[in-house]
Amino acid sequence: MRKIGKSHKLDNVCYDIRGPVLAEAMRMERQGYDIIKLNIGNPAPFGFNAPDEVREDLIANLAKAQGYSESKGVFAARKAIMHETQRLGIKGVTVDDIILGNGVSELIVMAMQALLDSGDEVLIPMPDYPLWTAAVNLAGGRAVHYLCDEE
């Protein structure tokens, strides 16, 4: 049987959400250290809960939440975003211009795949969220990091 190896597209991808940093944190936990993992953007375990109103609306609408939404996302949510762009004075944004996803990670990857050609350079602040660099590399672009210096 032929061994299936990883794609060379992953050669320049380092994504510590699931990589060596997480492995070290897990090793330290096994040794008894109390580790707060902020690497996956899940604030709930640290006491940052959704507002009661949001949770109540989710519960009230759960029975109707069967199946898929529209491919661009829930219309009411897209419309609310459009109204917010208008409130902010951003002109020309229609509800059809707005695409929702399952989270920022999915949307960053989709945007990079859609916008980058091989070799395109993307400026990324450093330190960065590893997904930004990974998404650029996977899309064939080249991440160009610049240092964020508060001075």
Write out the residue ranges for each language-model feature.
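PLP-dependent aminotransferase-like
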Residues: 113-151
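N-terminal small-domain helix-loop-helix segment of the aminotransferase-like
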Residues: 2-5, 11-103, 110
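Short, hydrophobic alpha-helical packing/hinge segments within bilobed ligand-binding/sensory domains
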Residues: 107-108, 132
